[in-house]
Amino acid sequence: KGSILGDKTRMEQLSVHPNSFIRPSPSAGSLGGVARKTRETIILCEAAGFDKIFVETVGVGQSETAVHSMVDFFLLIQLAGTGDELQGIKRGIMEMADGIVINKADGNNIEKAKLAASHFRNALHLFPAPDSGWSPKVLTYSGFYGLGIKEIWDMVDEYFAFVKANGYFEQRRNEQAKYWMYESINEHLRDSF
């Protein structure tokens, strides 16, 4: 099971690249927006030598936050021009974001994307500073024209340099390992009784 056709349709170039591996995992029946064994899959990919691992959730909502306990960088991707950019976002998800990207910033949507980015930047100032000490950035992106991808990579690289220098990266990895162990024990107990 999985959305292999949908994934490959959206990732024409990436899906055929010799250095990439795409593993669709159905999340049906599990909360958190990710499949039950996503954490284990991440560890396997790291062991296989993949240095950049992307985990896509099923959507945005309060239940799609489990992925935050599994990843080193939480990127929130939003569409502009839907009319309720900020109203539709749960506070908890915005507080988790290490970066926010406004997608489809092209054609008639460019100004809407810039406005949405401005709204998100303003909203981020209302939240307490993240434990990492990092100030999340808000960028725009056009997949159609390929505009903004360099800026997104630069943001991610800047984030990793920042959190590795201040020790937060290692602290976060330790927290992830503890959370994974806790969840594994809970899952085993639920399945046993």
Per-range role (PLM):
Residues 9-10, 65, 86-91, 126-130:
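Short beta-strand/turn micro-motifs at beta-sheet edges
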Residues 33-36, 66-69, 88, 111-115, ...:
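Generic recognition of short, well-ordered alpha-helical segments
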Residues 27-29, 59-61, 80-84, 105-110, ...:
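Conserved nucleotide-binding/hydrolysis micro-motifs of P-loop NTPases
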Residues 91, 96-101, 105-166:
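Canonical P-loop GTPase G-domain recognition
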Residues 1-63, 70-76, 84-85:
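Nucleotide-state-sensitive switch-loop elements of NTP-binding domains
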Residues 75-79, 101:
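Conserved phosphate-donor/acceptor-positioning beta-strand/loop module used by diverse small-molecule
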Residues 140, 151-193:
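Long, well-ordered amphipathic alpha-helical subdomains in the mid-to-C-terminal portions
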